[in-house]
UniProtKB/Swiss-Prot annotation:
Keywords: Chloroplast, Membrane, Photosynthesis, Photosystem I, Plastid, Thylakoid, Transmembrane, Transmembrane helix. It is found in: Plastid, Chloroplast thylakoid membrane. The chain crosses the membrane at residues 7-27. InterPro entries: PSI_PsaM (IPR010010), PSI_PsaM_sf (IPR037279). This is Photosystem I reaction center subunit XII. It is a single-pass membrane protein. Pfam families: PsaM. GO terms for cellular component: chloroplast thylakoid membrane; photosystem I. One of its GO terms (biological process) is photosynthesis. Belongs to the PsaM family. NCBIfam families: PS_I_psaM. Its main location: plastid. The keyword 4Fe-4S does not apply. It comes from Cyanidium caldarium (Red alga).
Amino acid sequence: MITDSQVFIGLVIALVPAILAFKLGLSLYE
């Protein structure tokens, strides 16, 4: 059974690298 905390941790693990890559892309684009 998957708990809410496991879902939240999974989302964080998935989103953090994407956000960092997005910010890095913006900084390189400027």
